[in-house]
UniProtKB/Swiss-Prot annotation:
GO terms for biological process: selenocysteine biosynthetic process; seryl-tRNA aminoacylation. Consists of two distinct domains, a catalytic core and a N-terminal extension that is involved in tRNA binding. It is found in: Cytoplasm. GO terms for cellular component: cytoplasm. Its EC number is 6.1.1.11. This is Serine--tRNA ligase. Belongs to the class-II aminoacyl-tRNA synthetase family. Type-1 seryl-tRNA synthetase subfamily. Catalyzes the attachment of serine to tRNA(Ser). Is also able to aminoacylate tRNA(Sec) with serine, to form the misacylated tRNA L-seryl-tRNA(Sec), which will be further converted into selenocysteinyl-tRNA(Sec). Transmembrane segments: none annotated. NCBIfam families: serS. Its main location: cytoplasm.
Length: 425
């Protein structure tokens, strides 16, 4: 959520930032007008309360002097009624203001490239060269089906489209990747492991920005008003909702494995086969709470931590800087890590690493106290996939296949596969 003072004092700047995003869904002038109305009402309430205090002191004084206090008491009653009425108006205006502020996206960082779609994202760097074969590479869903390690038909029968049923070596591969990623981030990168609930409440979804704007994208349990987690970012960030963290303890770095659940409401017809776009998938998530002055340096570290997974698996990838039109609602700046997929003959996103600055912290009321014991401030939050597990399985199947349909296990993963080096029929 944006600071209303920032909008009020830098209205033209915020309008320009929203224009960069291509946002036209709200009227910032109306937001400022609501804020002005709120402040006017609060001023009226304050004046009346001051008068009420003054008048209340006259009553005992008049009674002590034996004078009639009826008129003064009537004024007190009148003021009390007006204050109550104004308090109701203040609450109504504040609710309207919060409703609007919760729907305004984050301001893009000046270094975010201008653009409308993912075609306008800018490549920052590449690691290794794209994998090429002297045979026609198979798509990962065909490899998995032929090897008998993922059964898409059974998953569709059990549930529906966009689900996968892993079995045998396929299930072991998925589990091996989860453990490999967790161990790397905990033991090598210094993250603290968290195993959070897989369901969250409405306040948690609002705190990280999924609600209220994107409720249709979430899986909801209406009987409890709970939501299945779309990403571990939601429960892990909300661990510190309504808390003040000592500055000396920052940064806080967490890693969490969870299944993730997404309706993919806007993805009809896209990636309908395979593991790229599922309603349920596993993911290892990295979340950081940092001081504002450190947040962009910490974003570089987080991105490096995420890409290290692919380096150790020896899978080609690239890093792209996301443009304004592809940035998403909550991020001020974002990198995508895109893995090379031979059957697609292109790079496919496997991780997004974002700096939200104080956007989520304001929504979730997460603050820190500087070491010099100054005024508490909102901290910055970061997160990134480290990595999406199903997409990593897909990348291994496609990049490590041979002309006979077998798949070689990356060297770093063999200890987690109990010595299995090749998946064969």
């Amino acid at each position: 959520m944006l600071d209303i003072k920032r909008i009020r004092n830098n209205l033209d700047e915020i309008k320009a930032a929203m224009a960069r995003r291509g946002e036209k869904d709200f009227d910032l002038d109306a937001v400022v007008a609501l804020d002005e109305k709120r402040r006017e009402l609060l001023q009226q309430v304050e004046l009346m309360k001051n008068e009420q205090n003054t008048v209340s002191k006259e009553v005992p004084k008049l009674k002590k002097e034996g004078k009639d206090a009826t008129e003064v008491m009537a004024r007190m009653k009148e003021l009390s009624g007006k204050i109550k009425e104004l308090d109701g108006q203040v609450k109504e205006v504040e609710d309207q203001l919060e409703y609007t502020l919760l729907r305004i996206p984050n301001v893009p960082h000046p270094d975010v490239p201008q653009g409308e779609t993912d075609d306008d994202n800018i490549e920052v760097r590449k690691w290794s060269e794209p994998t090429h074969f002297d045979f026609e590479p198979k798509a990962h869903w065909d490899i998995a089906t032929d090897l008998g390690i993922i059964d898409f038909e059974a998953a569709s029968k059990i549930t529906g489209a966009r689900f996968a049923l892993y079995k045998g070596v396929g299930a072991r591969l998925e589990r091996a990747l989860i453990n490999f990623m967790l161990d790397l981030h905990i033991e090598e990168h210094g993250y603290t492991e968290v195993l959070p609930p897989f369901m969250v409440n409405r306040s948690s979804m609002t705190g990280t920005g999924q609600l209220p704007k994107f409720e249709e994208d979430a899986f909801k349990l209406p009987q409890k008003d709970y939501f299945l987690v779309p990403t571990a970012e939601v429960p892990v960030t909300n661990m510190h909702r309504d808390e003040i963290i000592e500055g000396a303890n920052l940064p806080l770095s967490y890693v969490a494995y969870t299944p993730c659940f997404r309706s993919e409401a806007g993805s009809a017809g896209r990636d309908t086969r395979g593991l790229i776009r599922q309603h349920q998938f596993n993911k290892v998530e990295l979340v950081k709470f940092v001081k504002p002055e450190d947040s962009y340096a910490e974003l570089e570290k987080l991105t490096n931590n995420a890409e290290k997974v692919l380096q150790l698996l020896e899978i080609p990838y690239r890093i792209v800087r996301i443009c304004t039109g592809d940035l998403g609602f909550t991020a001020a700046f974002k990198y995508d890590i895109e893995v090379w997929m031979p059957s697609y003959n292109r790079y496919v996103e496997i991780s997004s690493c974002s700096n939200f600055e104080d956007f989520q912290a304001r929504r979730a009321n997460i603050r820190y106290r500087p070491e010099e014991k100054g005024k508490v401030e909102f901290l910055h939050t970061l997160n990134g996939s480290g990595l999406a597990v199903g997409r990593t399985v897909a990348a291994i199947l496609e990049n490590c296949q041979d002309d006979e349909g077998n798949v070689k296990i990356p060297e770093a993963l063999i200890p987690y596969m109990r010595g299995i080096k090749v998946i064969t029929k």
